Design a protein with these regions (language model features):
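Short, linear, compositionally biased motifs with a strong N-terminal bias
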Residues: 12-13
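Gly/Ala-rich beta-loop-alpha elbow adjacent to hydrolase catalytic centers
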Residues: 59, 63
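Patatin-like phospholipase
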Residues: 20-57, 68-302
Length: 302
């Protein structure tokens, strides 16, 4: 081999090593049944070799549940849970959102495997006490987004501790009961971490920014299209951070809060879930194709 070919081979290997050593963080917003969209995004991220480089996952509500699933289950099992378990158990006893059904699903998931996960996993919840005062505070003093959010790391928790935090982050206000969490501060009741009207954080990027300054690529997956999303992360707010945003390319919310709840957040039908998984996959693949990126064989990551 000529010296030139040797040199080019070395350069290629160095570039390859740099590209594939990049770390990513994944931020998953909440949205109930719309969370199926994130499963499709994750599927595409695996095909393109990105999911294997995600070292932090931070989620709230449905995004928190997915954060845990992605860290302790295979993609195939996560997809099966959404398609086969969620439609029947989340609407158990004809409830809009069944906490009992979610509890049954979580009992079948190996949550204890999160401690062995490559990725650090965080979920967000809002302490339940004084909800009304928090709501009034937000109205009197302007935005309270994130002011009352608690960010829980799951990697060192037991099965029961993880389960309680997942039930808490997904405890939709009014519809669901708040959940007791042993939080190291005497224990408190918590509810949906994505409810920003009472100080929650539906785009929980904070644990990544504050805890992992070395991560320069952050993927944010929203569960509303750009027309309906109430808040989005701005790259200009974070110095030298590459913010990669994914929005559903279709309207998941409808034209009213009522439609958003019934047709979006509380829609757990198998057909809807299947559609959202496919749409999340297609939107993510489209993002990569427009940037002339292609799937990679990822067997060396497994």
């Amino acid at each position: 081999m000529s010296a030139k070919k040797v040199f080019l081979s070395v350069v290629f290997l160095l570039v390859f090593a740099i590209v594939f050593s990049e770390e990513y963080a994944l931020v998953l917003s909440g949205g109930g049944g719309k969370g199926a969209y994130q499963v499709g995004v994750w599927k595409a991220l695996k095909e393109y070799g990105i999911a294997q480089k995600v070292s932090v996952i931070s989620g709230t509500s449905a995004g928190g549940l997915n954060a845990a699933l992605f860290a302790c289950e295979s993609l195939e099992n996560a997809e099966k849970i959404w398609l086969n378990e969620v439609p029947s158990k989340l609407t158990k006893d004809q409830k809009l959102i069944s906490q009992e059904g979610l509890s049954e699903i979580l009992d079948s998931v190996p949550l204890e495997n999160i401690k062995d996960s490559y990725a650090q996993v965080y979920v967000t919840a809002v302490r339940d006490r004084l909800k009304l005062l928090k709501f009034i505070d937000s109205k009197l003093n302007g935005s309270s987004i994130g002011r009352h959010a608690y960010y829980f790391e799951l990697n060192n928790d037991s099965f029961d501790e993880i389960k309680s935090k997942l039930l808490a982050t997904s405890a939709f206000p009014v519809i669901c009961d708040s959940v007791f969490v042993d939080d190291g501060d005497g224990g408190h009741y918590y509810s949906d971490g994505g409810e920003e009207s009472i100080g929650g954080d539906n785009i929980p990027i904070k644990p990544v920014i504050e805890g992992y300054p070395e991560i320069k690529n952050i993927i944010v997956v929203y569960l509303s299209d750009q027309k309906h999303v109430s808040r989005r992360i701005s790259a200009k707010d974070y110095d030298k951070i590459n913010i990669i945003e994914f929005f559903p390319s279709i309207d998941l919310d409808g034209d009213s809060a009522f439609e958003s709840l019934l047709d979006g957040t509380a829609n757990f039908s198998n057909s809807r879930i299947r559609l959202l998984i496919q749409k999340g996959y297609e939107d993510t693949v489209d993002y990569f194709m427009r940037r002339k990126l292609y799937p990679v064989s990822s067997y060396w990551f497994e």
